[in-house]
Amino acid sequence: MTFRDRIHPQLRDWYDASAGFDFDHLETFVPKCNEAELANLKEDPQVVTYDRTIPGPAGSPDVKIRVYAPQDRESSALPCLFFYHGGGFLFGTVYRQEALCQRYVKHVGCVVVSVEYRLAPQWKMPAPLEDCYAALPWAHENHEELGIDPQRRAVAGL
């Protein structure tokens, strides 16, 4: 059975239009995408970026987050944007929308917390969603360290 055979019939036209995307060999395709994302990272001198590991959901692995903050802060308590990268919970990394997260920091004046959630098919739902949620209470409890206002939070993703 191919990947196409497992797709709902109403979505097969979309699949057929996705020529060049090797759905049947995700185990090799996904690492290539991740390598390409890492190779294209560009630092922005106006944005401080660092990685952290936070406690995962109960009984689950810890979760990696990537934090983006303004180099020159105007406040010690900025709004926080929780950002979830695209990829349909199947592929992608926190690096996928690095430039977009940097733009949010510069143009919105916020701190961005991007979550490296677990991916399918290695992890079944609701594991990715649980990882995404784990960042919310963690950031609330650690708002002073992050320099965020716990009352001004938003969620975004692609």
Question: Which residue ranges define each predicted feature?
Answer:
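Short beta-to-alpha linker loops that shape the active-site pocket of alpha/beta-hydrolase fold enzymes
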Residues: 71, 116-120
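A glycine/proline-hinged amphipathic helix-loop "lid/cap" segment
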Residues: 1-67
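Alpha/beta-hydrolase active-site loop
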Residues: 123-145
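Serine-hydrolase catalytic-loop signature spanning alpha/beta hydrolases and amidase-signature enzymes
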Residues: 83, 88-91, 95-96, 112, ...
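Gly/Ser-rich catalytic serine loop of serine hydrolases
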Residues: 123-126, 153-158
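Gly/Ser-rich "nucleophile elbow"/oxyanion-hole loop immediately N-terminal to the catalytic nucleophile
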Residues: 140-156
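Short beta-strand element of the alpha/beta-hydrolase
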Residues: 65, 77-87
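Short amphipathic alpha-helix adjacent to the substrate-entry channel of hydrolases
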Residues: 95-115
